Amino acid sequence: MARARASAMGAAPPPHLRSHDLVVVVAVAAAALCLACRGASAGGGGGVDVLDRARRPEFAAWMAGVRWAIHERPELAFEEIETSRLVRAELDAMGVAYRHPVAGTGVVATVGTGRPPFVALRADMDALPMQEEVQWEHKSKVAMKMHACGHDAHTTMLLGAARILQERRHELQGTVVLLFQPGEEVGTGARRMVEAGAVDNVEAIFGFHVSVELPTGVVGSRPGPLLAGCGFFEAVITGKGGHAAHPHASVDPILAASTVVLALQGLVSREADPLEAQVVTVTRFLAGDALNVIPESITIGGTFRVFSNEGFLRLKRRIEEVIVAQSAVYRCAAAVDFHAGGRPLLPPTINSAALHAHFQAVAAETLGASAAVLGAMEPCMGSEDFAVFSEAVPASHFYFVGVRNEAEGLVHLAHSPHFRVDDAALPYGAALHASLAMRYLDERRREGGSHPHEEL
């Protein structure tokens, strides 16, 4: 069903989808039917009526207007002052309580009873330092700043979910925590939110990201590893500078660095399990300016990605060992920094199997016949600081919301100056996010689980 949907919309099937998507969707539909019956008997919220609410002209127009306002005034990491003000104004209009500031410009709102269980929904707010090239009415009005990763859509969808939840607050069997996070693009926003206590006592969290690889109306995820852990490294290799005509009188760091680059490739091809995907990529190689001078030192750097915490730590250790040892072969010293420029090390994003089953069933029920649900996406080597929430909360799940619209030319990947979101996707994200939280609370109450923490 997922592939048929993509073809019908003129979109090529995304390369990371498995061939058994049809089987998965059939299974999801059966689970959704079961969940719908249970939800009806329990009087819980959710279902296709939530999507109908989000797609009503007034509601959809409001969401589009919010996104356009955010898109026109993009703000970089931890500079989201106006975006945060807009979020708070919308929450005020809904009558939703919130806490601000959190992690600088972040906002933490709550809807429901104020008592456990607590389930969180997260969206990021920051833009990228790049010039928008899309010519449209709501193009960025700030030079060299652009929402090229869809965070304007994420923030809008979470506000849409907040409105749905607030309208149905008397049905909630617990508390939904809404996280409007700053600083995702620099990789430190989530950790600062955690350190500020934003997810204290939260037992489950859901996050999402728009994807131009999925057509509008399609959502997808997978259990287990979804996004890679990400690290960066920078090494300064130092030798002895001298005249290029007398290399014997020098200690050439360029030769040492060249062999380091080659040796690093062996970490994946000869040390990693072929069934465990890993990437080591050198992206920086900077040395002297004069063509007749052997420089004193050279700086190299790059990134590494892996899908397990164990593999991540092992690869990090081996990168440093190889750089130092290989440099020493050519009489050079090497210093390796894994935090250059304040870059964090991000763990892999690993989805709870139980929450993924919940996602599949709720998505099929909520989005109904108007959307395909993809349950077996391939892992992606991209990374997300949502993984930091995953380490702080007992259960977590991250998924993708399709925004591809070939008829409108909305096909450019994130971080492209031509990237643009299909506004028709906003109701899908808002409705699904709200339904995931409502159904989760319903399920937890029916389970009769213990709640040692009585307040968030």
Curated annotation (Swiss-Prot):
Gene Ontology molecular-function annotations: IAA-Ala conjugate hydrolase activity
Top EC class for this record: hydrolase
Primary site of residence: endoplasmic reticulum
GO biological process, one term: auxin metabolic process
EC numbers, comma separated: 3.5.1.-
Gene3D superfamilies on file: 3.30.70.360, Zn peptidases
Motif (Prevents secretion from ER): 453-456
InterPro entries in the cross-refs: Amidohydrolase, Bact_exopeptidase_dim_dom, ILR1-like_Hyd, Peptidase_M20, Peptidase_M20_dimer
Claim: Signal is one of the keywords in the record: yes
Keywords: Endoplasmic reticulum, Hydrolase, Signal
Leader peptide range in chain numbering: 1-42
Keyword Zinc-finger applies: no
Localization, UniProt: Endoplasmic reticulum lumen
Gene Ontology cellular-component terms listed: endoplasmic reticulum lumen
Lineage top rank: taxon: Eukaryota
Chain's role: Hydrolyzes certain amino acid conjugates of the plant growth regulator indole-3-acetic acid (IAA).
Family that this chain belongs to: Belongs to the peptidase M20 family.
Protein name listed in UniProt: IAA-amino acid hydrolase ILR1-like 2
Species whose genome carries this gene: Oryza sativa subsp. japonica (Rice)
Gene: ILL2
